[in-house]
A protein has these predicted regions:
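Active-site glycine- and acidic-residue-rich loops that bind
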Residues: 14-17
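Short beta-alpha connecting loops at secondary-structure transitions
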Residues: 1-11, 229-237
Length: 268
């Protein structure tokens, strides 16, 4: 399916405001649609957050633009030509040059110069360019934020979005029960390499999310090739915002189960 899209995952209205500006820059730089993922809790409920602030000195990032001067210098322009190896080609504004830099394109097969083709190898070449661009996006999107437990631990938790405030409180409840977890808040997809590293550094990682299918867990497994057994799904989907009590209860019960010492088999 068509799943390779860039997603931004804010935790509250303040971060959503900031990510909205980031989304416009990313759309220009990556030349693709950027989805700013708001859930109903953030979009409709009252929430405490940092004041919304805007920097009037901020400049738009228009990405790779080929100018009339560059065209006059003889630069090789192809609308889908990857000259830098990052999957992102140069583009031109309409009317940039009277005779150069214009092109016609279509939504099906085309070559690096936007010319129609039905040749399979050319189609595959463009698909591979899109793969490179998606990999490039990993280092452009907002990176995950990690917070380590007060004590060394081999357990972690991954979460995103409006789960954040409940998770902060849940960590305190879990620590009171003697359970310590490092945590990683994912803020964008495609995932930065630190997501795979975080999973690899822990014996078990709880993936807490507010849907019935464990979609984030599936993405982490599919994108990083992680053993599913090591990612424990904690899902909440009754239509109300997730609570710290629910998170602490689900994780705490699983942690208690891990600490149970099995009885040795009786020797006759």
């Amino acid at each position: 399916g068509d799943t390779k899209h860039v997603l931004l995952l804010p935790e509250d209205p303040a971060e959503a405001f900031e990510f909205a500006a980031v989304a416009f820059d990313l759309a220009e730089r990556l030349q693709t649609t950027i989805f700013l993922m708001l859930d109903l809790d953030i979009g409709m409920n009252h929430r405490l957050c940092r004041p919304l602030r805007w920097d009037d000195a901020r400049q738009y990032d228009r990405g790779k633009i080929m100018t009339a001067e560059m065209l006059d210098e003889g630069r090789d322009f192809g609308r889908y030509l990857d000259v830098d190896g990052d999957g992102i080609p140069y583009r031109t504004y309409p009317g940039t040059h009277p005779t150069k830099g214009s092109f016609f394109t279509r939504g099906t097969s085309r070559d690096r110069y936007a010319r129609y083709t039905e040749e399979g190898s050319v189609y595959a070449d463009n698909v591979q360019r899109l793969v490179r661009k998606f990999e490039t996006a990993q280092d452009m999107v907002p990176r995950p934020l990690q917070a380590n437990a007060a004590k060394p631990t081999k357990y972690g938790v991954i979460y995103f979005g409006s789960t954040s405030p409940a998770m902060d409180e849940a960590i305190e409840l879990l620590e009171a029960r003697g359970h310590h977890l490092n945590r990683l808040r994912i803020r964008a997809f495609p995932f930065h390499s630190s997501v795979a590293s975080f999973a690899a550094d822990h014996d078990f990682v709880y993936v807490v999310e507010q849907n019935s299918d464990g979609q984030l867990r599936s993405l982490i497994i599919n994108e990083n090739g992680i053993d599913p057994v090591r990612l424990v799904s904690i899902v909440h989907y009754d239509g109300t915002p997730i609570t710290a009590r629910f998170i602490a209860g689900a994780i705490g019960d699983h942690q208690d189960h891990l600490k149970v010492t099995p009885l040795r088999k009786a020797v006759s």
